[in-house]
Design a protein with these regions (language model features):
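Short clusters of small/polar residues that mark proteolytic maturation junctions
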Residues: 17-18, 55, 299, 330, ...
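Active-site glycine-centered loops adjacent to acidic/histidine catalytic or metal-binding residues
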Residues: 112, 258, 301, 342
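Proline-centered loop/turn at the N-terminus of a beta-strand
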Residues: 106, 183, 253-255, 271, ...
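RNA-binding accessory domains that recognize and position tRNA/RNA substrates
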Residues: 1-216, 220-221, 235, 346, ...
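Active-site-proximal beta-strand elements of phosphoester/diester hydrolases
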Residues: 183-187, 297-298, 337-341
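Cysteine-nucleophile active-site neighborhood
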Residues: 224-225, 229-296, 304, 348-366
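Catalytic beta-strand/loop cores that center a nucleophilic Ser/Cys/Thr
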Residues: 292-334
Length: 368
């Protein structure tokens, strides 16, 4: 069956369908990771996006029950150069194509993903339509009518999934759980399972609360620390969350990742802006301005903190060596810090996992 990817600027790419059928719209973006497609597909941060994988062959190792980053596929569509016809992996339980069909995600193969990525890199991320039923002209028109990611609150659209500490513990299946050292409240803006695993494996008892939990509700739980998760959409739209997080800053140690980093930045008085085509891949070099250390990081974001708006009492700690955008901040006197990238990986390098230990050390210092 024919499938069409149409962009709002009139670009049309025609290929073959796999997965579900129908029509979906979203923001077209690209990911440069060679592996980790299942983690990408199930990452809530990709909600509302049609993702192009630049690696030429996708689906080689199938799908398995262990590599989910949420309970289901989250992307609006999936674009690959070639879908593997045969998958092979000892953990695999299903091929990628049939799994996407069950998940209701439309896929297209047989298109020039290098051309798509280069076009988005030059022209910027844009609205798109992926369809098995519209004409090219109709698909372009559908893309142009799709909502823009800028100004879009997707956190409320995907909803939150509160979890008890016991439910978080159940995510760690491959090793013995360490003793609990600290109680942590984690805000769910679209939290990845591997973040929860990393927090638990670092000695935190984790309770996951909804995105709109109030500062009063969180403080009533008497946590040793607060964590702000990743998530989709425009961080500037989450003004009520900025307010509640601002009310927590200084009262309890705080660590944020990705969208959580952007929310902390807003709560501290900074602003965010939309990147031309975003950072999505597993090989982004980040420099720690305090130590000079370089980490190779996994990233997935379309917005960034504007360095010119960072207040004087906040330090920019990390920058991206590709474009010099802000990758981390820390308050100069209060126990709060955040990073734009994903130290938990899944997929990607594990260089920055030390940040979870730094958070624990911050809490320990605070309690002394």
């Amino acid at each position: 069956m024919r499938a069409i990817l149409a962009l709002e600027d009139g670009s049309v790419f025609i290929g073959s369908h796999f997965g579900a059928t129908g029509t979906e719209v979203g923001e077209a973006c690209f990911n440069t990771s060679m592996t980790g497609y299942q983690e990408v597909l199930t990452d809530p941060s990709y909600s509302g996006q049609i993702v192009t994988m630049t690696y030429p062959l996708i689906g080689n190792y199938g799908v398995n029950p262990e590599d989910y980053e949420s309970g289901k596929a989250q992307v609006s569509g999936f674009v690959v150069a070639e879908l593997a016809k045969v998958h092979s992996n000892w953990r695999a339980t299903e091929a990628l194509g049939p799994w996407l069909e069950k998940q209701g995600v439309i896929g297209i193969e047989g298109v020039d993903t290098r051309k798509i990525a280069k076009h988005l890199r030059s022209a910027g991320a844009m609205r798109a339509c992926l369809t098995t039923e519209l004409t090219p002209e109709e698909a372009v028109e559908a893309a142009r009518k799709a909502p823009s990611m800028e100004g879009c609150n997707i956190v409320d659209k995907i909803g939150s999934h509160p979890m008890t500490p016991e439910e978080v513990d159940a995510l760690v299946t491959d090793r013995e759980l360490p003793p609990v050292e600290y109680d942590l409240v984690a805000f769910d803006f679209g939290i990845k399972y591997n973040i929860l695993r990393q927090l638990r494996e670092n000695g935190f008892r984790v309770t996951v609360v909804p995105a709109h939990a109030t500062a009063e509700e969180v403080l009533a739980m008497k946590p040793d620390g607060v964590f702000l998760s990743n998530g989709p959409g425009d961080p500037a739209t989450l003004t009520d969350i900025h307010r509640e997080v601002g009310a927590l800053i200084g009262k309890v140690p705080m660590f944020g990742i990705c969208l959580g980093h952007q929310i902390i930045s807003h709560a501290l008085g900074a602003k965010t802006f939309k990147l031309k085509f975003g950072h999505r891949g597993a090989n982004h070099p980040v420099k720690d301005l305090r130590t000079g250390k370089i980490s190779i990081t996994s990233q997935n974001h379309g917005f960034a903190v504007d360095p010119d708006t960072v207040p004087d009492d906040v330090e920019i700690t990390l920058v991206n060596l590709n474009d010099n955008t802000v990758e981390g901040i820390a308050h100069k006197t209060l126990p709060v810090f955040s990073v734009q990238y994903h130290p938990e990986a899944a997929p990607g390098p594990r260089d920055p996992q030390y940040l979870f230990r730094e958070f624990k050390q911050m809490i320990a210092s605070r309690k002394q």
